[in-house]
């Protein structure tokens, strides 16, 4: 199987064979780099620009495509997602924080599924580590309770669960030197996501609500948690 001419190496064929019947997309949607699979990072046939992810090493490319497909798989199985009230536009702080929150929580069941196949993403993780180290070292500390304060805390929780112990130790020390308050919130968020059962939609939804409420963003429809099984919002 290929995407835009690039081979999707093992274990992708086995992964695709296992999940294709549960997805509301086609084989062509994957191989053509479509918006249905890759969102705003899709391939535009009318443009000479290729998506950045197409330059990834073979193993990381296979992981990346599996990652995007697993997002769709989770929605098809009723795992929750994040929305916001109609008063908040796409570029609002609520949209940004909500998107980061969804990624943080949903990545737990997502990685739980992908890990069963033995995908690797060394290049992606190295890039994330170097980018985070540079950004944290040079960035100004966001004010307490601001949207960027929440995104920094969410990033803390996420990075603490995916980086190697040595890499995380470096970043954690930078976080501590920058803002103990962000560290405190990040630790609480991490505790919630690491204690939930990633295979149960109800428990993932509960964890998402807890994280949202912990940040105080459950008022005025600022961040809504959507149960994709019935459309109910919390």
PLM features: residue spans?
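Short acidic alpha-helical/loop segments enriched in Asp/Glu that coordinate divalent cations
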Residues: 80-86, 120-130
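Short, conserved phosphate-binding/catalytic loop or strand-edge motifs used
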Residues: 88-90, 130-135
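Pan-zinc metallopeptidase signature
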Residues: 132-234
